[in-house]
Amino acid sequence: MPRKHDETDNEYRTRVIDPISDSFCAAKWLNATIWLGHGGTASCHHPPAHNIDKEEIKTNPSAIHNTRHKKKMRQMMLEGTRPKECEYCWKIEDMEKDSDGHRPVSDRTFKTVIYSDEEIERIATMDPADDVNLKTLEIAFDRTCNFACSYCNPAFSSTWVKDVRKFGGYQNIKSDARGHFIDDAPYADPFVKDEENPYVKAFWEWWPELSLELEELRITGGEPMMNDSVWGLFEWFKDNADIHPNAKNMRFAVNSNLGGKPKLITRLAEASQHVNKFHLYSSGEAVGLGGEYIRDGLIWSEWKQNCVIMLREGNIEGFHMMMTVNALCLDSIVQFLDWMLGMKREFGASKPRFSVNILRFPSFQSALTLPDHLRQLYHTELREWLNGVRARDEKDQHGQPLVAMWEEEQLTRLIEYLDVVKTPHRNTADKDLLEHDFRVFYEQYDQRRGLDFRKAFPRLVEWYDSLEFTELAEPENDIQKPKGERLVEVFAHREVSEDGEVTVEEVRQRTRKTGESKDDYDDTKYADEPDYKKSGSSIGWDPESDGLGGQ
């Protein structure tokens, strides 16, 4: 069992994790997110993604997970050294106490406790340079998506790509987030339609071995329902249900924004009937107009109905809500929690379960950009909501608490975070610069999307209007130009300095096959030409140069 009966997360950490080291996290061995579309990987959603070696996977397909970088991080964790890329957890743990006065529980505990004690002992005693098969895997086939959420970017959303291609890169952003919004992230889509993708090829080569031990396969995106490969996986489960030794034991999960048309939602519900253990993940953190503003593309009333349709008509073992806590969602986060409570009362405590994920990048959208009086207001509202839940102590029809202990612990962590932590991450710009970027970003966001910040967040208007920003005398020239104002063969090229500063210059590309790297050139004339569609960090952060990945 992952944890003993009635064992708290802190008790588990003391019993299992601490004896290994002060920085151990099983996710570095047993969990991965892999962006097959362009060849990026990470062991959880907090560190920046890093590149998969395209040459190494030719002889070792498991290197789409077992990269040299991860093996280095594993060695550090076994030695008790804190990898800098895992700073999210170190910030939580260094708070010393949560809002209940307990030792804070970071995500490395949550991401370790899901595995058996035997698995933990096995990886903790193996050579960190050895390859290991995953237990939980999240993959994305491409970035096709019908949403363009404010905290997302073109690397993950084709709708974001359309925004930047139509209007050009976002102007006048000065902090660490600039690299997210200055171009259409061409590296995230490096292969033409009929070109073989070596990362997808490696995945399928590893699959016969991997599928025997894998406990959960989770598909993310983009929006998975818009990719044919996802429906192919549903067919795999249907065809192998009775012949594959692990098909009925493996959880198959899909991360969906559930913003599809009714026909697509019905197709998903029908496809789930052929999966023995199907789990559905969706995202949300705010209600109504605010939720629609943050998650552009969302229609709040339709999304709620789609959640209900999936729970009533789908074969759903687990329904999970991923909350990305940002500066804007706190204005209605309590109402969103109330909506989830209502769902739990109707469908059971686990439908949905929720996770509270604190946004750090882009840092100007972090909750820590807010002024002290708003942070204190939201801190109080969340504390009162949680106190009410504890006082009522509601159970579902099976006697399970509507809000699980670990859900409460994540909320107490957020409550304390709003009170104690001052910067989203160690390379964050100063507060004035974050406020500047907050204002200039959302002014452009409104103009491009036909939205209205002031209507969506009336309690933030006074502060928002007080934010000072420097207007540009003329448009910046080092970012991607709007459609119609640039030559087809001219694109933005991103460079990241050792300090994490992003600079971009436009470069002229020769006509060549999409995805061709400069190592493949056969013409010395172009030997020094920047590589256009180059695989890179999935979110525009280079773990070797931004100070977050390694020593």
Map each language-model feature to its residues.
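Radical SAM enzyme [4Fe-4S]-AdoMet core and its adjacent flexible, acidic
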Residues: M1-A42, P47-I57, D100-T109, V161, ...
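Short, intrinsically disordered, charge-biased short linear motifs at domain edges
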Residues: D9-T14, N66-E79, N133-A140
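Membrane-interface junctions of multi-pass transporters
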Residues: D18, H46-E93
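Recognition helices and adjacent regulatory flanks at domain boundaries
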Residues: K97-K135, C145-F147, G168
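Core AdoMet radical
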Residues: L134-T144, A155-P198, S211-V230, N240-L264, ...
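Long, low-complexity, intrinsically disordered segments
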Residues: E505-R512, S517, Y521-Q551
